[in-house]
């Protein structure tokens, strides 16, 4: 359930973009009605409407996520606050300047922030964040914890580069597909491969 909750803005982003692609006139009319006041020249074209509407919905969905958690009195992960800040800045720039380049950079910036946090904590704070999150599930030698942390740093750096490659080499529609299916698929594949390699260290349930 948490997995779907975390994916909520991404799924809505994908759904709204696909709707806009298939209903360009309706998307333009909707975008002109609700976004004309926040775009720089007050004009939402048919070609821009799908990505602008999808971006606006993703921003709203992320705000609603945090609002829901606050109302429920639940702890909000720092990663969610970071995601909110990045999508507000880059998504807001996309809408205001009606330029999809900004939102296409959003996943890369988020991935690289994760990588920087893991690396900074390990080098300067002498704290292994991956170990902090996973040590209740497995017992590893210090050297393996170190390499595991670095593997996640490398993964996030690589994901950021792959996102940029797709964003600049293919159409916006292809990038939107990759954002949901490609990015999530690579994440799942990495976690599964890592789990198989570390399975012998998993703690048995008491």
Swiss-Prot record:
Bilayer-spanning residue ranges: 51-71, 79-99, 105-125, 150-170, 178-198
Subcellular location field: Cell inner membrane
Predominant localisation class: membrane
Entry keyword annotation includes Cell inner membrane: yes
Superkingdom assignment: Bacteria
Keyword Transmembrane helix among record annotations: yes
Pfam families, alphabetized: IspA
Bilayer topology annotation: Multi-pass membrane protein
Its biological purpose: Plays a role in cell envelope biogenesis, maintenance of cell envelope integrity and membrane homeostasis.
Name recorded for this polypeptide: Inner membrane-spanning protein YciB
Organism, scientific name: Janthinobacterium sp. (strain Marseille)
